[in-house]
């Protein structure tokens, strides 16, 4: 049994809000869609983050504009909203692929709005 599963079974959802980080989860080898399905109603906060193969450094993946990577961010956001209990969306991006952080903020916000959030 994984530590995450032990935590999820042990934490009282009426006392603790779980924030699922869909990008870091992918980077760690898990699939956010599967986790949302396994624990419906448990993820009030969703860390919306997409990943691509890293261009260098020690990491295998780096963050990118949501919807442009390999995480299936839109499908995860939609499912988390539908069955995961998600009400708060926190967009995160630490790598910018030649853009400025503000350009990425604007693009990520535009995409979330296009998705209906």
Predicted regions mapped to residue ranges:
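Histidine-acidic metal/acid-base catalytic patches
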Residues: 1-20, 24-117
């Amino acid at each position: 049994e994984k530590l995450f599963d032990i935590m999820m079974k042990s934490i009282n959802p009426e006392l603790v809000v779980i924030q699922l980080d869909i990008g870091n989860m992918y980077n760690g080898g898990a699939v956010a869609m599967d986790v949302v399905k396994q624990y419906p109603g448990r993820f009030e906060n969703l860390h919306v983050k997409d990943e691509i193969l890293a261009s260098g450094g020690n990491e295998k993946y780096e963050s990118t504009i949501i919807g442009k990577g390999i995480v299936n961010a839109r499908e995860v956001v939609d499912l988390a909203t539908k069955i995961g209990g998600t009400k708060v969306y926190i967009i995160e991006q630490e790598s910018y692929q030649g853009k400025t952080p503000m350009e990425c903020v604007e693009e990520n916000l535009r995409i979330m709005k296009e998705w209906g959030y």
